[in-house]
Curated annotation (Swiss-Prot):
The lineage of its organism: Eukaryota, Fungi, Dikarya, Ascomycota, Saccharomycotina. Keywords: Amino-acid biosynthesis, Aromatic amino acid biosynthesis, Isomerase, Tryptophan biosynthesis. This is N-(5'-phosphoribosyl)anthranilate isomerase. It comes from Zygosaccharomyces bailii. Belongs to the TrpF family. PANTHER family: N-(5'-PHOSPHORIBOSYL)ANTHRANILATE ISOMERASE (PTHR42894:SF1). InterPro entries: Aldolase_TIM (IPR013785), PRAI_dom (IPR001240), RibuloseP-bd_barrel (IPR011060), TrpF_fam (IPR044643).
Length: 205
């Protein structure tokens, strides 16, 4: 089971996530989004991660694979997250890093059976991502139980300290991913990051 704090834009928030045991922290590498990370801050966050056991994820959306690989090298990413309509197999072989691939439920569920958990892990999220829109967890859990799949998925979309315990109980979940749910007025809230991760740890151990 893993916990991911996404959409980080400050060294302070990244340090809080690392100090409180986040497995993954994510920076948005898509240009001109409200949570797009400043390149200098991304490099600083990368330095915070290395040697701690927390892995750095770069989030991309329909960007050329050459750009993805360039930024992956520049920021020393550990994982690449594809949030658009990319062919994950093409990107996996070119970028050479483990992938998270956004899956919209129920539209994209046929893709999940094609994903190899070692190379590409599905991440259920809304179409836009980062919107705070809660998915239909019951429907996703029921689909997973009926699917006969052995590999699980990360769950995003509308998570917060208020519902992370519920999210961890959804069938097939191997990780939880939060962004807006640990913000106050559009900025990462250090207390909420700590609360989310503490609740996560208590309920997975």
């Amino acid at each position: 089971m893993i916990a991911k704090i996404c959409g980080l834009q400050s060294v302070e928030a990244a340090q809080q996530a690392v100090d409180n045991g986040a497995d993954l922290i994510g920076v948005i590498c898509v240009p001109n989004r409200k949570r797009t990370v400043d390149p200098e801050i991304a490099r600083s966050i990368s330095k915070i991660c290395h040697g701690t056991g927390t892995r750095l994820v770069g989030v991309f959306r329909n960007q050329p694979k050459e750009e993805v690989r360039q930024l992956a090298q520049e920021y020393e990413l550990d994982v690449v997250q594809l949030h658009g309509d990319e062919d994950w197999q093409e990107y996996a072989s070119y970028v050479g890093l483990p992938l998270l691939k956004r899956v919209v439920f129920p539209r994209d569920v046929s893709l999940v059976s094609q994903m190899d958990g070692e190379v590409c892990t599905p991440l259920f999220d809304s179409e836009a991502g980062g919107s705070g829109e809660k998915l239909d967890w019951q429907a996703i859990g029921s689909w997973f139980q009926d699917s006969q799949l052995t590999r699980g998925y990360l769950l995003a979309g509308g998570l917060s300290p208020d519902n992370v315990v519920e999210a961890l109980r959804v069938p097939g979940v191997v990780g939880v991913d939060v962004s807006g749910g640990v913000e106050t007025d559009g900025t990462k809230d250090l207390a909420k990051i700590k609360q989310f991760l503490e609740l996560y740890k208590v309920n997975v151990n």
